[in-house]
Curated annotation (Swiss-Prot):
InterPro entries per record: GOLGA6L, GOLGA_cons_dom
Protein name listed in UniProt: Golgin subfamily A member 6-like protein 9
Segments of skewed composition (Low complexity): 366-381
Species: Homo sapiens (Human)
Record family assignment: Belongs to the GOLGA6 family.
Composition bias type Basic and acidic residues, residue spans: 349-362
Coiled-coil segments: 157-354
């Protein structure tokens, strides 16, 4: 015969520890119900004693008429404060009981969940074992069905051994089935116990909730009474503080009047400052416009001088043209003309130095005024940018006359440049 197989103990919790924890939980629950089983809470007797000891404390809904004395008001306040303290202590006791009951509920649910888990795991293990035993039994039946060769009897035959093993496996299956049945019954009992405990806990929570609602109602009533008492005290204090309040109001009005006057003065100062700034800006604008007018006048005077110089240059060139028309005239007149031309050239250079910032534009306009190469130029005519006559045009003039004409032409070109620069500056001034 094979030895009786035993199931391995569950690693999480053995049966003895489960029973011990369940017994401890039952004891705690029983002690809690013994402490809190009476329908009337512990604070109710106190409330009855307080209400019975002072029946005249709460009259007409818990507050006195406006004509009551101050001593009655303060006596009612002391009674309401003691009642409020009792209610607070009852509320604290109920909160502690609710916390302990919730802890017990959580512990019981954890125990039940652990028991259910262990029972499920054991059930799976037993089912696995039953399946394994069934497979081994099936194998043994197949082996017994196969014909065996006859062997000499040497002790018990193989058929007897197989029969013994089959009987042993059948007994193991029966024992495992009984264990499974016991576990199922145990699980059913635990689930039933769990449901009963949950129902009791729900009932207890409902009772606690009802007690809390009653306490809340009492607190609301007490708050209303305290509010009425506070209103009465405020009315009395207002009656006592009316003269002082009038003085305070007068002082506040005086302070407000001073603040208004100070703000008005600050606004006036700000307006004066803004007016001064505006006047200063207007003065600056007037000075700027005056400077601009002076600059324009100076520019116009300079343009007039340039026009006068140009007119003088034209007169000089006309005299030179006349002298070229008569090449055999005296050299003294040419020298005088050359001197006057050189003086004009020096004046033009001085004007160029004074208006040097505007010279690039004048050079561009002078380049634009130069004659195009190949264009016919009439003899005896003069243009800005022309360096003088050539000896081929006037073969009758000597080298000195030609040089003098070239110098005069250079002076005329410089005068044209200065004139155009002045015109450009005048144009810029007009645009601005």
């Amino acid at each position: 015969m094979w030895p009786q197989p035993r199931l391995p103990p569950h690693p999480a919790m053995s049966e003895k520890t489960q029973q011990g924890k369940l017994a401890a939980a039952k004891k705690k629950l029983k002690a809690y119900w013994q402490r809190k089983s009476p329908g009337i809470p512990a604070g109710a007797n106190r409330k009855k004693k307080i209400n019975g000891s002072s029946p005249d404390t709460f009259t007409s809904g818990g507050y006195h008429s406006p004509g009551d004395s101050a001593t009655g008001i303060y006596g009612e306040g002391r009674a309401s404060s003691t009642t409020l303290q009792d209610l607070e202590s009852q509320y604290q006791e109920l909160a502690v009981a609710l916390d302990s009951s919730s802890a017990i509920i959580s512990q019981l649910t954890e125990n039940i969940n652990s028991l259910v888990r262990t029972s499920k795991e054991e059930k799976k293990h037993e089912i696995h074992l039953v399946q394994k035993l069934g497979r081994s039994l099936f194998k043994l039946k197949n082996q017994t069905a196969e014909p065996l060769a006859p062997q000499p009897p040497a002790g018990p035959s193989k058929m007897e051994q197989l029969q013994d093993e089959t009987n042993h496996l059948r007994k193991e299956l029966e024992s495992v089935g009984r264990q499974l049945q016991a576990e199922v019954e145990n699980n059913q009992m635990l689930s039933l116990l769990n449901r009963r405990q949950e129902e009791r806990l729900r009932e207890q929570e409902e009772r606690l909730r009802e007690q809390e609602e009653r306490l809340c109602e009492q607190e609301e009533r007490l708050c209303e009474q305290e509010e009425r008492l506070r209103e009465q005290e405020e009315r009395l204090c207002e009656q006592e503080k009316l003269p002082g309040q009038e003085r305070l109001l007068e002082e506040v009005e005086k302070l407000l009047e001073q603040e208004r006057r100070q703000e008005e003065q600050e606004r006036l100062l700000e307006r004066e400052r803004l007016l001064d700034e505006v006047e200063e800006l207007l003065e600056q604008e007037r000075l700027r416009q005056q400077d601009e007018r002076l600059w324009q006048q100076e520019t116009l005077r300079e343009l007039e001088r340039l026009r006068e110089l140009e007119r003088m240059l034209e007169l000089g060139w006309e005299a030179l043209y006349e002298q070229r028309a008569e090449p055999r005239s005296g050299f003294e007149e040419l020298n005088n003309e050359n001197k006057s031309t050189l003086q004009l050239e020096q004046q033009v250079k001085e004007l160029e130095k004074s208006g040097g910032a505007e010279e690039p534009r004048g050079s561009e306009s002078a380049a634009a005024a130069r004659p195009v190469a190949g264009a016919p130029v009439p003899q005896g005519a003069w243009m800005c940018g022309q360096a003088g006559w050539t000896p081929q045009e006037h073969p009758g003039l000597s080298g000195e006359a030609v040089g003098t004409g070239e110098a005069a032409g250079g002076a005329g070109e410089a005068a044209c440049h200065s004139f155009r620069a002045a015109e450009n500056r005048e144009l810029n001034i007009t645009i601005i």
